[in-house]
From Swiss-Prot:
Organism: Haemophilus influenzae (strain ATCC 51907 / DSM 11121 / KW20 / Rd)
Keyword Transcription regulation on entry: yes
Gene Ontology terms for molecular function: DNA binding
One cellular component (GO) term of this entry: cytosol
Keyword tags: Cytoplasm, DNA-binding, Transcription, Transcription regulation
Family statement drawn from the similarity comment of this UniProt entry: Belongs to the TACO1 family.
Gene3D superfamilies associated with the record: 1.10.10.200, 3.30.70.980
A Pfam family the protein falls into: Transcrip_reg
Superkingdom to which the source organism belongs: Bacteria
UniProt-recorded name of the protein: Probable transcriptional regulatory protein HI_0315
HAMAP family named among the record's database cross-references: Transcrip_reg_TACO1
Places the protein is found: Cytoplasm
PANTHER family the UniProt entry points to: TRANSCRIPTIONAL REGULATORY PROTEIN YEBC-RELATED, TRANSLATIONAL ACTIVATOR OF CYTOCHROME C OXIDASE 1
GO biological process: regulation of DNA-templated transcription
């Protein structure tokens, strides 16, 4: 989790947990159904749905399963009463944490989220307590490319910013509504998109030391273990030196 990379620091991913296909598939299907319900089943006109489809495909979900989930969202049914809820709180070291949930039972969800904060030395805040520290953005990851050519293509496609990373990759930021069109423009210019999603970008970050970094990672792990939690965002910054000791 390199300190220079927002992509690496914003969301902590656990490969071992993601390998539990049943659990991750359940969350992916929920997002597909909800995205289709809210914005319709046309991927080209629904950025949230397109991001959900891309994520499902990257996790080896079949097209048939994806299409069935979209059809359920468009057609209605027992599983389309899911609602998105954002919980905000404070994690170890004074970090700001936002927890995006998809649930049909708010009481059940809060009973999962609140203890996770408490057990890790944090506390669940009120609505708006840390949300002002984040901005909703589209984020595109390019593994490697010629910087000048990619910058030109990204600007032409409507990107807001492009940031080269120490490992040779590039992070491209867009207005979240423009994620799909910017991605299309970049791909049309011949570049391969490794990952693209709507995310929350912190305006400020908190440097974590060897004592606080493991506590934040434990909090993220506990939250991601909750069935109703879709995404966890934070503003913790873990530098390479600290990460190498974890």
């Amino acid at each position: 989790m390199a300190g220079h990379s927002k992509w690496a620091n914003i969301k902590h991913r656990k490969a071992a947990q993601d390998a539990q296909r049943g659990k991750i598939f359940t969350k992916l299907i929920r997002e597909l159904v909800t995205a289709a319900k809210i914005g319709g089943g046309d991927v080209s006109a629904n950025p949230r749905l397109r991001a959900a489809v891309d994520k499902a495909l990257s996790n080896n979900m079949t097209r048939d399963t994806i299409n069935r989930a979209i059809d359920r969202g468009v057609g209605g049914g027992d599983d389309t009463n899911m609602e998105t809820k954002i919980y905000e709180g404070y994690g170890p070291g004074g970090t700001a944490v936002m927890v995006e949930c998809l649930s049909d039972n708010a009481n059940r969800t809060i009973s999962q989220v609140r203890p996770s904060f408490t057990k890790c030395g944090g506390n669940l805040g009120t609505e708006g307590s840390v949300g002002y520290l984040f901005s909703k953005k589209g984020l595109i990851l390019i593994a490697e490319a010629d910087e000048d050519a990619l910058t030109e293509a990204a600007i032409e496609a409507g990107a807001d910013d492009i940031q080269p990373q120490d490992d040779g990759s590039f992070e491209i930021y867009t207005a979240w509504e423009d994620l799909g069109s910017v991605r299309d423009g970049i791909e049309a210019a011949g570049f391969k998109v490794q990952e693209a999603e709507v995310t929350m970008i912190p305006s400020t970050t908190v440097d974590l030391d060897i004592e606080t970094a493991p506590k934040l990672l434990r909090l993220i792990d506990m939250l991601e273990d909750c069935d109703d939690v879709q995404n966890v965002y934070h503003n913790g910054e873990i530098c390479d030196e600290v990460a190498s000791q974890l």
